[in-house]
UniProtKB/Swiss-Prot annotation:
It is a multi-pass membrane protein. It comes from the Eukaryota. The lineage of its organism: Eukaryota, Amoebozoa, Evosea, Eumycetozoa, Dictyostelia. It holds the Pfam family TRAM_LAG1_CLN8. Keywords: Membrane, Transmembrane, Transmembrane helix. Residues 46-245 form the TLC domain. This is TLC domain-containing protein 4 A.
Length: 258
């Protein structure tokens, strides 16, 4: 089953990725306009661009996370060396996320007035080009490690959902609080605990010398990513506590009748 799915997905050429992402950026704005019009709500030009960007990012995150989980779960079928083993499915996943980074970077540049953000551009260049394209697709190494890093993607839908709810003025809705707690949980469990432990185990148990560029990228980026994840987790928890305190103070107090 694993080999069948892998062989099917790998048959998708780069043209398939180009058509896939192009179609998303074409039909999502039209769909958004229709949904907002049917609900008698206005959707500005800037909002439409931002909604489209975040919806595509959410779809990409869900697909990347799901396929990475499946590939990691079946690692006994393809991993003989945790540092060097690759398979058709891992190759497909890295191509999928790399094309997302490319299209998202282009989207940020084309609509720079609404979206441009230097940290995101730098992230796409460092993570997308150096890690996934160079190490994963060109150098053909550490696929398992890169798949573990892609588990970080599970937090992105909750980050974007927070923005969606905020834009819809639903900050006081119960969904906003639930989304915040789920986001904090996955930040702590996946980004701060699970993935770092797994990646460290790979390098302790089966370290294989890579070339100088790959070694520099991995040993320079991993500590930075870990520190950033801890900092972002702090901001997430701080935001939740702030929201809870604001909600508590805004709740009308009912006076007891004597």
């Amino acid at each position: 089953m694993f080999s069948y799915i892998s062989n099917y997905l790998i048959s998708v050429e780069p043209l398939g990725f180009i058509l896939y992402y192009t179609s998303l950026y074409i039909w999502i704005p039209s769909l958004l306009q229709t949904i907002f019009n049917n609900n008698e709500k206005q959707l500005s030009y800037s909002s439409k661009i931002e909604w489209t960007n975040k919806i595509v990012a959410t779809i990409s995150s869900i697909v990347s996370f799901s396929l990475s989980c499946y590939c990691i779960y079946n690692k006994k079928s393809w991993v003989t060396n945790e540092m060097t083993s690759t398979c058709a499915l891992s190759d497909f996943i890295l191509k999928f996320i790399s094309f997302y980074f490319l299209f998202d970077a282009l989207h940020l540049i084309i609509y720079y007035k609404q979206l441009f953000d230097w940290p995101i551009i730098i992230h796409h260049l460092v993570v997308g080009i150096l890690s996934y394209v160079y190490i994963g697709l060109y150098y053909k190494k550490v696929h398992l490690t890169l798949l573990y890093f892609l588990l970080f993607e599970i937090t992105n839908p909750f980050i974007h959902m927070k923005w969606f709810l905020k834009d819809l003025k639903l900050e006081n809705h119960i969904l906003y609080s639930i989304n915040g707690f789920m986001m904090a949980f996955f930040f702590i469990f996946i980004r701060d605990i699970y993935v770092p432990i797994k990646v460290v185990k790979i390098y302790i148990n089966g370290y294989t010398e890579l070339n100088s560029i790959a070694n520099t990228i991995i040993f320079f980026c991993f500590p930075i990513i870990t520190i950033l994840n801890l900092f972002w987790t702090y901001l997430v928890i701080k935001g939740i506590l702030k929201h809870l305190s604001r909600t508590k103070t805004s709740t009308p107090q009912i006076k007891k009748k004597n």
